[in-house]
């Protein structure tokens, strides 16, 4: 289900964003988002752990916060996960199946849909990184991340999400 959601969203999001009256694109996004929502039952991971804590403290929009944090966490999670990366890239119809290309394409999509580069751009200060990381470590979504994370790694992920810039 998650892969089908990914196919639909990667296909229809740019169209729905640029042509909001395109009913077929909006329908594709509707089905994709429903499938993604059902996929949450398998677990959420670090993107949501961090986003839950950022949203709780800074009242940020959860979807926007997730989008900003996503490439940072993907860089952490996808290292050494070549078969999973290839499956995701194939479902996004990418010719190159590397983690770098996958993340680059996600960042390009973020740029085309006006998603900020980092959490700092939506008002999250760098000095909260340690506190947010500690809270995110005990969030239930952390336990379902495909890769274990230490507090130091979590803090680095939070800091990068706050001040990092997209590579594309």
Regions found by a protein language model. Name each.
Residues 3-14, 30-34, 47, 51, ...:
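Predominant activation on well-ordered alpha-helical scaffold segments within soluble catalytic domains
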Residues 126-168:
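Short, amphipathic C-terminal "tail helix"
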């Amino acid at each position: 289900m998650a892969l089908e959601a990914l196919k639909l969203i990667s296909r229809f999001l740019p169209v729905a964003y640029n042509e909001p009256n395109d009913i077929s694109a909006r329908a594709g996004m509707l089905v994709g988002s429903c499938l993604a929502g059902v996929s949450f039952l398998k677990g959420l991971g670090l993107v949501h752990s961090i986003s839950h804590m950022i949203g709780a403290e800074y009242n940020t929009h959860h979807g926007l916060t997730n989008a900003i944090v996503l490439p940072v966490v993907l860089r952490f999670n996808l290292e050494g996960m070549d078969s999973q990366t290839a499956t995701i890239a194939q479902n996004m119809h990418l010719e190159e199946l590397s983690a770098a290309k996958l993340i680059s394409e996600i960042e390009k999509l973020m740029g085309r849909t006006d998603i900020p580069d980092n959490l700092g751009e939506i008002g999250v200060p760098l000095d909260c990184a340690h506190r947010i990381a500690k809270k995110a470590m005990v969030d239930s979504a952390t336990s379902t991340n495909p890769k274990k994370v230490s507090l130091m790694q979590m803090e680095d992920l939070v800091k990068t999400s706050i001040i990092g810039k997209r590579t594309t």
